[in-house]
Amino acid sequence: MNEKKEQALFEYDAKLSISEAIPMGLQHVVAAVVGIVTPGIMIAKVCQLSPSDTTILIQTSLIFSAVATLIQLFPIFGKVGSRLPVMMGASFAYVPILMAIGADFGIAAIFGSQLVGSILVIIVGLFIKKIRVLFP
């Protein structure tokens, strides 16, 4: 019997060779850029932003996706982040809501609503152990 031992491409503390890391990294970047850029383009179109403001919105999406990806890969204080090669990006779940807000109130209202929402998520996160008993 000839058994072939299969080895995972990524292990928790593995070090990839450069010949494995570059193609995998390029694949992740190509797959992620479309998903990160598209929500910004859709929201900019609804809010009737100028081309320069649209560019800033797209660049901001790319920068914060990179920061979130780095936090996942290299955890902060060992608590925030998974230490796994997880590509973070923009979520399409909120695009219809943001488009509705942007069509009526503009891009400033979108940023304000996201700021309030992020503060609420932080507050809920502080009390998650106490809240968890409410959700069996």
What residue ranges belong to the model's regions?
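Intrinsically disordered, low-complexity non-transmembrane regions of multi-pass membrane transporters
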Residues: M1-M24
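Early transmembrane hairpin of solute transport permeases
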Residues: A21-F135
